[in-house]
Amino acid sequence: MRKIKILFLGDSITDAGRDKRNYHNMGNGYPRYASELIAAENQDFDFEFINLGISGNRTSQLFDRLYKDAIELQPDIISILIGINDIWHRHDINNISTTDAQIELNYRSILERIKRETNAKILMLSPYLLDAPDKGNMRSDLSTVIPIVENLAKEYADVYVPLDDIFAEALKVQPEPKFYSGDGVHPNPNGSQFIGEQYAKAIKPLLK
C-alpha cells in the first residue's frame, strides 16, 4: 500500500483548534473534513495527515518556521492557505502593515524553498473573504492580493483552489454569508466542511 504524507500549512483557518501537542490532530476545521473525505475515497493509500496551521500567522511567520514545520518532515503533498492575516493586520489596532510586494516576496520565498528542498507536490488555496459588516475595507486589499497568489500558483503549484471565487459561486445558491462564516474569515462547521470538500476534490490529480 502506497504511503502518502499530506501536510496542511496555514493560519487559524487551518489551525481550527487543533491539539498543538499532536500534529496528527486535525482540529475542527477544513483539514478534518478534507482528511476524512480523502481517506474514505482513496482506500488504496496509507495516508499520514499533518496539521501545522498556526492561528494568527502571516506569510512572513510561515516562512520563518518552514524548515521545522515542512522541510524536515519531507511530505509528499504540501497545501498552503495563507495571506488573510497580512491584510487583516493592515486594519487592526496593531497596525502591522505588510505591503502587496512583501506578501509576494514572502510567499515566493516559501514556494521556492519548498521546491528547492523537498519533492513535495504543492496545493495552494487562495485567501478569501465573505461579506461581513466590519470587513468591507479588506475587500479592496484582497482584490490585489488574490492575483498575486494566482500568479504564484501558476508558477509553482501543482493544484490551485480559488476559494474566493468558489465561495462567490456558492453564495449565488446560498446567499447568506453567515451560513459559512460568522465574521467573513473564520469558517463555521458549514464553511469548514465546504472548504474540505473543495480540497478533497482538488487533490485527486495528485494521488494518481
Name what the model sees in each region.
Residues 1-55, 66-74:
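Serine-esterase "nucleophile elbow" of acetyl-processing enzymes
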Residues 33-45, 61-208:
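Alpha-helical cap/lid subdomain in secreted, periplasmic
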